[in-house]
């Protein structure tokens, strides 16, 4: 009895000591909750934006066991949640991640109240609950959808700057409606824009983050149910700006799984107006911690941009021969002068599948027997072949008593040109390979008694040799007197994609080519090998040198040369054909022309760094790829050209006098600075959309004008700053001309400050452009006849000679 009384006393005292938690009505007690629920007032409050990472660091002392919980449930590590002792990170947080988080060490706990809320970006989100509240309707009151807040839908035109977040809303109600968005009258899918978009059905909203000019358009919201349909339209205009950090494509890099010994690949697509710096890093641990004393994480740089690394190469990270130590997080970081962006992905490594033969290995004595038998069989076959050849040789000596046949074999040794000048920029110090064809006389008594035969032996280079069986030749792209270029498909020429076919261009000789033509083609191939690869030059992909005709495989440019490319995009107002049926290609903006100039300058800067002098830089020798990338071509050619429209015939061959610097024209001295002069003429071609330099001027008159200091006028669609850059390139003293490095820096600055909205001025005088119809009235003024380097460019009812400005400012016609 005494024990029962003591037990009753303890129960009563515990009930009295327990605090009471109730709602407003004190007669209805609340069920008891875990103690952690009553410490929310002491928790740290963490507001987080959706999509941003959630980082929590436990202030408690680091003990042997740290436990993280959310709303009382223990958190586990997964592809979004990372737990490293007292550090918790949740990537790309969502509203479902809101709640009460706690870290516990022994008997101590610390709480975090996390609230993931949507940021107000467009100024109209005062009430995000429009149309999202619960309601009940009788079956008799069911009707078609209707708008609940038309005031917030009155603003139909939204004009925002690039890289901002846009939120379009159409709040509606009625039971079971469906919400659909269209862009320009077509279904709007996630893959239609970089980074995708978000649709919040409970708030009737469409959210697009980091908008770009391609997001411009008409967006239609359609709300419907079985009783009817309503729609509302917004017009979105995105104003491009260059001041934003790099944009990384959503979903890249993606999580990857690999087996031990295999390979893994991560891809990171970066979009940036300013030149971005990209690198791949992997976060590591030191002394059991991922963070240093300064709070910054430890990391190891796996891959970074360099001089010889193209943008396509840096955007892909390959992990070869994967091991368990390679498992973990890999991060792509892209930065520019505005800011830094980064995306991460995880590599999961699984053990390699077990080979069933390893469970039952073949005894070593059986292997020895197999190898011995094979070696014996091979030895017997070799002996039989040798005996047969000896018998056949003896028979031929008995049956044939005629004179021996001499076989001429021509070999092509390659030598590097020796430096003979102290000036490192002169043409006498270039690294052009010298190709000589030597003849070797062989005696052969086994051949039939035919006439002498000439053969060519090209040195085998395994690094560049490509199998002819994997090359499929296509249609011709162009040809000269002794050579031609054809389109082809090369299977597996890209070592990163060995099973895919790539469209390439193949250079080859015609049947009537001479030994000098062969030597020139070999010299060009060797020059491209030495120079290496760059984004803005035509790169060598491979060569077929053995077992047939010499094939030199280079990159293919789908849009032809730059001169044709610019002329095809001239507005109709600039043409003289007055062909109303002709539809020009897309109109080019001022920024497009500056971009072309900048890319060519980058390519020439790289060639100059490799001590390569082009000698024939012009728009016709710049090719344009499918993605509008400028690539300099023919930088390894021997300069013995044959083009009557652009070259003056002299005793020394044919020279591109329109583009040549005075020291090259009169003294035959070629340097990097003479290439800078040609670059200035190329700039003039670009800003006249493919115009002919010095139109209608005879050769003899041009020589006189250049010596007197005359220069071409400023093109109509060219700023004063760019024209002064041309004039600097045309300075009479070579050392006073800018270097390509300086030109790249100036053009990069101009390109950064230029917007896409600056279209060409169509009201400018047309005398800067060459007409599209054949020469007529001015042809008689050219005293050079068919050998003239100029195609006279007559203007309707205008004089044939344009104005030229003297260096002292005097204008002469």
Curated annotation (Swiss-Prot):
Residues 1-14 form the signal peptide. Expressed in the anterior neural plate in early neurula stage embryos. Later in development, the protein is also expressed in the eye anlagen, midbrain-hindbrain boundary and otic vesicle. Residues 471-760 form the Protein kinase domain. Residues 18-367 are extracellular. Residues 21-117, 145-237, 246-348 form the Ig-like C2-type domain. The second and third Ig-like domains directly interact with fibroblast growth factors (FGF) and heparan sulfate proteoglycans. This is Fibroblast growth factor receptor 2. It comes from Xenopus laevis (African clawed frog).
